[in-house]
Amino acid sequence: MSTLDKNLLLEMFRKMEEIRRMDLKIAQLVKKGKVPGMTHFSVGEEAANVGAMLALNEDDLITSNHRGHGQAIAKGIDLNGMMAEILGKYTGTCKGKGGSMHIADLDAGNLGANGIVGGGMGIAVGAALTQQMKNTGKIVVCFFGDGATNEGVFHEAVNMASIWNLPVIFYCINNGYGISADIKEMTNVKHIHERSAAYGIPGMFIEDGNNVIDVYEGFKKAVDHVRSGKGPVLIESVTYRWLGHSSSDPGKYRTREEVDMWKEKDPIENLRKYLVENKIASAEELEEIQAQVKEAVETSVKFAEESPFPPLESAFEDIYAD
């Protein structure tokens, strides 16, 4: 049994519930035509996001990717502001200009999601260089999917971070598919983290990315390594997205049997069973958390729907940095 604190375990459960319920609610709003632009959901990948994020200090920084809802929530974004942003409202965290794929929350240390595959990697290296030069003690985590590891910027970013011994973790959430392309067709290495050897940095493998405790404990080792000044780490966590690549993808390249098999590994249900069976938390405690999260999500929808769209003059705001 894990020695992790009960409060931490309950926070894991709460954050995963927030991600699941927010994404499913957003999916409903997409079908109603209320969400402009593309959306990419994190359903099924909750543990891979939450376990990693809770291993960080609150003031550490991240860069996200197009499938960034889970990362934003795990990093502590205000749910009202997030929902408003996704609906394109002026009360959103980016005043409605970012939407689903470009959501950012600088107050929480989220430097932003990115619609360009691998687009956050150079930003993460730059942010890590800043922390090193200013001696802040903060580290940066760059979130990306398996498909991004075949982009040229992956090589450039990891190589530069290695040369300069930067405080950055490159975190690959491997869900097995780059849109519809099976990872086995895209690379000859068995595991993506093995590529770390080419850059002279450690590679870490979290085989069960649906086990939030495994993710947390594995990630904590990487965090300690980087924060102690030993340089970057490449981590790979294996998980699975239940839904299509995006809101427009029916996922016909996967079999129903494959999806159902992974749903049996539901990260939230796995943690719920663990907490109850080991008498860490009662079923009633967890149901109360679920009820609180459900209410918070409904409140976020009400807030977003009642919020105004950006005024025309706001198009000329935020063009230059202060």
Located regions from the model:
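N-terminal glycine-rich anion-binding loops that anchor highly charged ligand groups
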Residues: 14-30
